[in-house]
């Protein structure tokens, strides 16, 4: 299935009765073909989805709520189109379930089937909301730099690194990431963290490169994977991890993480803009 066939950008009817058929899978291969990623992935990682608008009825008809966090493996054959995900979660609103465990197991089964891979899921009931505090990316902020920018489509040639000097290890981040939905054209606002070991990357060049996504159209996952590929190709780090946190739309935020070395999966930190 393609993004153009999805509910994204089209009028939709909202059902409040549970319906697993609302989930619309999109093959990762289509977007990866566009940026030159073949069957052997140059990274591993996960997409962290947070859903803030989940509610259902208990066996006595009383509404229940929870925040859901999903971990979708980067090697899953499919992602789920975000509007269909919203419609699917909304279909729980007037459906009765015996317990939160049944809700979790139902969602995990359906989303795993749509993605074609086992998806991890945690539901946070209100008693656990205090665990979900605000945090910001660790590292050195690139946004401190006072510079000119004039390129607003991704251009890997902007990147620079000290290829002839001793390797360094750095963690850098920017809150100036912006791209646009390829179907609706709506802006996607985000923050991105880059952790690497290798030739030192020119900070100003990296910030200009991040800014260059401003008029780019691409899904969140594809943008992060393109950043990963471009930094690997031009800057030649030995180790690289790219982690983006996008602001929510339709009660969902999507946060892709890609790395080529053995790191634990990142914390699901919630930034101030999320």
Curated annotation (Swiss-Prot):
Gene Ontology cellular-component annotations: cytoplasm
Record: active site: 181 (thioimide intermediate), 188 (proton donor)
GO terms under biological process: queuosine biosynthetic process; tRNA modification
GO function terms (MF aspect): preQ1 synthase activity
Compartments it resides in: Cytoplasm
Catalytic activities: 7-aminomethyl-7-carbaguanine + 2 NADP(+) = 7-cyano-7-deazaguanine + 2 NADPH + 3 H(+)
Location (main, coarse): cytoplasm
Pfam assignment, any one: QueF
Residues bound to NADPH: 82-83, 249-250
Keyword Nucleotide-binding set for record: no
Family annotation (SUPFAM superfamilies): Tetrahydrobiopterin biosynthesis enzymes-like (SSF55620)
Oligomeric form and interacting partners: Homodimer.
Family per record: Belongs to the GTP cyclohydrolase I family. QueF type 2 subfamily.
Function: Catalyzes the NADPH-dependent reduction of 7-cyano-7-deazaguanine (preQ0) to 7-aminomethyl-7-deazaguanine (preQ1).
Protein name: NADPH-dependent 7-cyano-7-deazaguanine reductase
Protein source organism: Paraburkholderia phymatum (strain DSM 17167 / CIP 108236 / LMG 21445 / STM815)
Gene: queF
């Amino acid at each position: 299935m393609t993004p153009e066939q999805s509910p994204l950008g089209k009028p939709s009817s909202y059902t409040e009765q549970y319906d697993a058929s609302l989930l619309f899978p999109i093959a990762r291969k289509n977007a990866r073909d566009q940026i030159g990623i073949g069957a052997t992935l140059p990274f591993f990682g996960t997409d962290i989805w947070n859903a803030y608008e989940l509610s259902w009825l208990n066996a006595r008809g009383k509404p229940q709520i929870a925040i859901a966090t999903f971990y979708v493996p980067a090697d899953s054959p499919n992602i789920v189109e975000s509007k269909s995900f919203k419609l699917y979660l909304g279909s729980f609103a007037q459906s009765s379930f015996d317990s939160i465990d049944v809700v979790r197991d139902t969602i995990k089964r359906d989303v795993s089937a749509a993605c074609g891979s086992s998806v991890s899921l945690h539901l946070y009931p209100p008693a656990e909301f205090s665990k979900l505090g605000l945090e910001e990316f660790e590292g050195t902020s690139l946004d401190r730099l006072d510079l000119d920018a004039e390129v607003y489509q991704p251009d890997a040639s902007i990147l620079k690194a000290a290829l002839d000097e001793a390797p360094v290890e750095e963690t850098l981040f920017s809150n100036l990431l912006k791209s646009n939905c390829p179907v609706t054209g709506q802006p996607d606002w985000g923050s991105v963290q880059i952790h690497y070991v290798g030739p030192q990357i020119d900070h100003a060049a990296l910030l200009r490169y991040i800014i260059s996504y401003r008029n780019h159209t691409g899904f969140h996952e594809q943008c992060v994977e393109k950043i990963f590929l471009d930094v690997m190709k031009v800057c030649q780090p030995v180790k690289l991890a790219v982690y983006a946190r996008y602001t929510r739309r339709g009660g969902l935020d999507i946060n892709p993480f890609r790395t080529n070395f053995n790191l634990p999966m990142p914390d699901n930190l919630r930034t101030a803009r999320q």
